[in-house]
A protein has these predicted regions:
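Conserved CoA-thioester-binding segment of acyl-CoA-metabolizing enzymes
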Residues: 1-59, 97
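C-terminal alpha-helix plus adjacent terminal tail
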Residues: 1-17, 63-65, 172, 176-177, ...
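Short, charged helix-to-loop "capping" segments that act as catalytic/coupling loops
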Residues: 15-16, 25-28, 59-69, 125-138, ...
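Hydrophobic/aromatic residues within transmembrane alpha-helices
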Residues: 22, 58, 71, 121-123, ...
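Charged catalytic carboxylate motif
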Residues: 35-39, 91, 98, 198, ...
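Glycine- (often His-adjacent) and acidic-residue-rich active-site loop
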Residues: 52, 60-95, 114, 145
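Crotonase-fold acyl-CoA enzyme core
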Residues: 97-212
Length: 279
């Protein structure tokens, strides 16, 4: 988006009292800007406080994009000035940590690019399922001289091991659904024709179970597996400090000159173009 226009960028479809679908809808690129974060904050609060809710699925209404990178045309201070959330973290990492800790099951249905923030949302969800043909996950930040801000340095090593986490982060490559499954980046990948039906059936099944059993089982798995908040906070601080570096700004300018931030080949094949910036 080119401004802070307050159109609805996230829609909640309450399929039943126990099962919600949250639809990301910020065309044409599903960028994450300050207004998106503000709207997401409200949804996270609703998820935390609804006593009947047991499972929520995140999906996209925008063809080609699950959730994309940040809106670099928005003012950075509009994002950083959003007050810290209940966890004490800044707004975006606070949303992700609260989602992971919420007493409901969160599922990412990934079709299209999950770039940067989209990858971070998928990692914060309890489960994620990728379209084999259409899903692309990417932590692209190192390729432009940045550090990712939503916690992938803390989450990825716990999912796939140190070496593979460093490969994903330091290569800034596009990771397709089948490789994402092999690495443990997502739970599973499916042929696109089977993707929706599987996720809906799983969510419906979980939504039929008792919330007490769901929330307590998740709480105990969280205690055994999640990074401490201090690791998430350190990543956010490094990200914000990296954005204004002259070397980062120079690489970002090259990317913008080639068509970044507009519908087209650069956004569709970001991993390829990021890999050419140092040439």
């Amino acid at each position: 988006m080119n401004s802070t226009a307050k159109t609805e960028q996230l829609h909640v479809n309450r399929k039943s009292p126990s099962y919600w679908r949250v639809i990301i809808d910020n065309p044409p690129l599903n960028l994450m800007g300050p207004e998106f974060v503000l709207q997401f904050q409200k949804i996270i609060t609703d998820i935390e406080n609804d006593e009947k809710l047991r499972v929520v699925v995140f999906e996209s209404a925008v063809d080609g994009f699950f959730l994309n990178h940040s809106d670099f045309l928005a003012k950075l201070e509009d994002l950083t000035s959003i007050p810290q959330g209940p966890t004490g973290l800044e707004a975006w990492p606070d949303i992700l940590v609260r989602l992971t800790q919420a007493p409901v099951v969160s599922i990412a249905l990934i079709r299209g690019r999950a770039t940067g923030n989209g990858s971070e949302l998928a990692l914060a969800c309890d489960m994620s399922f990728a379209s084999r043909e259409k899903a692309i996950l990417s932590q692209w930040e190192v390729g432009v001289g940045m550090v990712a801000g939503g916690g992938p340095m803390a989450r990825l090593p716990r999912l796939m091991g140190r070496g593979r986490a460093l490969e994903v982060l330091l290569s800034s490559e596009d990771i397709r659904g089948d490789l994402a499954e092999l690495y443990g980046y997502v739970n599973r990948s499916f042929p696109d024709s089977d993707h929706d039906a599987f996720v809906d059936a799983l969510a419906t099944r979980i939504g039929s179970f008792e919330k007490w059993a769901i929330s307590n089982t998740k709480r105990l798995v969280n205690a055994a597996s999640l990074p401490p908040d201090v690791e998430i906070a350190a990543g956010w601080d490094a990200c914000i400090n990296s954005i204004t570096r002259p070397a980062t700004q120079a690489r970002m300018k090259k990317l913008f000159d080639q068509g970044f931030h507009k519908p087209g080949d650069v956004e569709n094949r970001l991993g390829f173009y990021v890999g050419k910036l140092g040439s």
